[in-house]
Amino acid sequence: MNFNATLIGQSVAFLIFVWFCMKFVWPPLMNAIEERQKRIADGLADADRAVKDLELARSKATDQLKEAKATANEIIEQANKRKAQIVDEAKAEADAERAKIIAQGKAEIEAERNRVKEDLRKQVATLAILGAEKILERSIDPAAHSDIVNKLVAEI
């Protein structure tokens, strides 16, 4: 194998080319590759964080939904209890009002009955006096006396 000047010149040119590439071309390429790798890694990390945040948000939403349902059920239960209480109070009030009205009606009936009895007594007394006067006026005749007593009994 012959070593001539061309081979040495080509070797020197190749070494200069390699040195030039290593000094000026290779570092920007490596920086671009490293920067791209870093952006990809950051993007993947952000995606992982987003997935974790999404799961956390779903978990919180589920917990809040459960809490809201529990609160709603509690409010509904309290409303039902209050409804039952109001109904019971209304029934008790209605029963008391009914008893009051019945007692008042009975008292009015009793008062009216007593008034009617008193009027009847007065009328009976008046009739008895009138009957006695007529009997005394006709006391001579027993048939008339019997007739007046029968009329008086019929009127009473």
Curated annotation (Swiss-Prot):
Keywords: ATP synthesis, Cell inner membrane, Cell membrane, CF(0), Hydrogen ion transport, Ion transport, Membrane, Transmembrane, Transmembrane helix, Transport
Gene Ontology annotations for the cellular component aspect, listed alphabetically: plasma membrane; proton-transporting ATP synthase complex
CDD domains assigned to the protein according to its UniProt record, in alphabetical order: ATP-synt_Fo_b
Membrane-topology descriptor: Single-pass membrane protein
Location, primary (coarse class): membrane
Subunit and partners: F-type ATPases have 2 components, F(1) - the catalytic core - and F(0) - the membrane proton channel. F(1) has five subunits: alpha(3), beta(3), gamma(1), delta(1), epsilon(1). F(0) has three main subunits: a(1), b(2) and c(10-14). The alpha and beta chains form an alternating ring which encloses part of the gamma chain. F(1) is attached to F(0) by a central stalk formed by the gamma and epsilon chains, while a peripheral stalk is formed by the delta and b chains.
Protein name per UniProt: ATP synthase subunit b
Protein's gene: atpF
